[in-house]
Amino acid sequence: GVGAVWLCPVYDSPNADMGYDIRDYEKIMSEFGTMEDFDTLLREMHKRDIKLVMDLVVNHSSDEHAWFIESRKSLDNPYRDYYIWRDGKSGKEPNNWSSFFTPSAWSYDEKTGQWYLHLFSEKQPDLNWENPKLREAVYAMMNRWFDRGVDGFRMDVISLIAKAPGLPDGQGDGYVFAPEQFAFQPKLHEYLREMRRRCFDGRNCMCVGETTFVQPENAD
């Protein structure tokens, strides 16, 4: 029989990328119902001894997330460093990275005159995991889901949350897809161990990561 169900993203989203662009981590997409409907689902699953695993996308958010809306208001906004903003170089992007979805991994913001990083679409700005306030906000959100009763998380592209220090160019001319600069970087395990301590330790839960570009020998 069924022992667990993994829900692909059901959070509030404008659906630019099938729900992997989250607008609100603590609201259910209207197409799927309400938070009360979610609580009913979770309760009925647990009555039947079925676990519920949520998809979690914390490499990036939607550009319609409240954090990003605040972040792009000004250079000194308290949420500015929740995302990765950089000055351009000679009127062009901060580096030559391409994204999974677009020729350049950077989009220009006219209002503040800086570029923001998005390893996927321009509708999915990357979160800045070097900012401890961002990490604390993510952990608090995860713990609220655990307190609600969810049994674990499947973590989308979690191996991409740490970028190479200084965001150096990839090797080659033009736009370059450079996973060696944004996948499985030195701080990745530091962040994941901190997450384990803050969210998973002491709980009867599970976690599985989509670890893009990571090989079995890299496991630690």
Predicted regions, residues:
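Short, aromatic/basic amphipathic alpha-helical patches
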Residues: 220
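Hydrophobic residues within beta-strands of alpha/beta enzymes
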Residues: 5, 153-155
